[in-house]
Amino acid sequence: MKTRPTVTKSLVIACLLSLVVYSLGRAKDNIAIKFGVLPALQALPLFVAESRGLFSKHGVDVELILFNTTAEKDIALVSGSLQGCFADLVTPMILRGNGRDIVVVAKTYDTRFDRRMFAVLAKPGSETRSLKELEGKPVAISSNSVVDLVNEKLHVDAGVSKDTINTIESKNIGLRFQTLMTGQIEAAALPEPLVTVAISKGARLLGDDSGLGESQTVLVFTREFIKNNMDLSRRFLAAVEEANNLINENPDSVRDIMVEQVRLPESLKSQYPVPKFPRLAPPDRDALNSVLSWLKQRKVIHSEIEYEQAVNEQLLP
């Protein structure tokens, strides 16, 4: 008579324990990263990584959360609703200077590699032809933001004294654009692609940031998230880097994503150039220090922030 092999109770327990350990490991790997983004050209690699399945390819579960304003995005990050976000150099330093443990993990875009991000424009029909001629006239901006910094630097570089720079608050970019184009304000600082749209409709370009290092865009995570998810953070950045390569090698293949996510006006959908993106890299030390110095002069932040505190270079692919 044949006998069946007996499975011992200890072996069953061992198998179950192994399964539990494996499942816990997989659960940790499958943490859903909620990452805040804006409908900005410089965020295109993130949209491409999501749309083309590159996050999944690298084993990362990512949910891109779209915000219409920087303020809304920052509130979500501070509240703990996000693990990270797309940003300029200014905002993370403001948060960090006010006690939020935010870390920059990569620079994604720099005007020195391609073209402008922001510009100061005079209204259609304006007789103002230079930033020097604009001296003392109101410019619509969003205060203590990268567009505020760009506006100030462009004026100063044009020989305008800081004391004579006149600005008016306009947080909503769409409203800022409309009030410029309808002549309700003399000038405004705007981002691309609205700069191109405004020029095509008669606004006059007075200056742009094509040579300013401070106009960088970056990716940030909370330090707590990085501490608990180092490998996941690296794979996230690897997916974004692959998206950069895809965009640069075949820009037309992602035009549909750019048109949809960046909300290009109808007149630009077929002709606006797809940006080229540099390799992911740490933010420029000099540019970051310049931003910190500007924020301290404005008394927006008061504490000293070292580059090594604000940046983690160890996660780059």
Q: How does the language model describe each region?
A:
Residues M1-A32:
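Short, low-complexity disordered leader/linker segments with a strong preference
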Residues K28-V160, T167-S170, T179, E186-A189, ...:
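Short, glycine-/small- and polar/acidic-enriched structural segments
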Residues A40, N68-A71, F86, I141, ...:
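Soluble non-cytosolic domains of exported or imported proteins
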Residues Q42, S51, K73, T91, ...:
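Stable alpha-helical elements in mature extracytoplasmic
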Residues D61, S161-K162, P265, I301:
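Conserved H-loop
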Residues V90, T164-M258:
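Pocket-lining segment of extracytoplasmic ligand-binding domains
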Residues N228-H302:
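Secondary-structure end/capping motifs
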Residues K296-P317:
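Conserved C-terminal helix/tail region of periplasmic/extracytoplasmic solute-binding proteins
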